[in-house]
Amino acid sequence: MGGGGDHQQLSIKQYCLYFIIGIAYTDCFICALCKNLRLSTTMKLFVLLSILVWLAQPVLNRPLSIFYTKQILPRTYTPPMRELEYWCTYGKHCDFCWDCKNGICKNKVLDDMPLIVQNDYISKCSITRFIDRCMYFIEPKIPYIHYMNCSLPTYFS
C-alpha cells in the first residue's frame, strides 16, 4: 500500500485551489478597473490575496500540524506525543506505537488495531525529521531506513 491515491487527491485539491485563486485574481483586477481604482489599491488587493494563498498552502497537504512541519526533529526513539498519531499511522510496527504488558500489546494510537502477542512484527524504531524529509530507522528490518516526504507520507512495507 503506497501513498499513490493520497498524492493524486492532493494534486486535485491543489489544482482546484489554483483555479479558484486565478478566478479571484482576475475578478479582483476587473473590479478594480471597473471602479477606476488606482493602481496602488489594486496592488494592495493582489498582495492581500497572495498572503491568503500562502497561508492556505499548509492546509492543503500537511498531515502534521502547520506549527511543526518545518521544525527539525533530532533522531529519537520516542516521538513527541502530539506527533505520535502521525508516526504510528505510517510505521504501525514501531515499538513506540505499542503498549506491551505480559506479552500482549495494544496499539497506543490506532483503536482499530487488534491486540497482538509481542512478536517480530514490533520493531525497534527511531525517527527523525529535517525540514520536509521524514525518516524511520528500523531495527533489524531491511531496508533499514524508510525515507518519505513529510507532507506526502508513505507506508513502510
UniProtKB/Swiss-Prot annotation:
It comes from the Viruses. One of its GO terms (cellular component) is host cell membrane. The keyword Membrane applies. The chain crosses the membrane at residues 14-34, 39-59. Keywords: Host membrane, Membrane, Transmembrane, Transmembrane helix. It is found in: Host membrane. It is a multi-pass membrane protein. Plays a role in virus cell tropism, and may be required for efficient virus replication in macrophages. Belongs to the asfivirus MGF 110 family. This is Protein MGF 110-13L. It comes from African swine fever virus (isolate Tick/Malawi/Lil 20-1/1983) (ASFV).
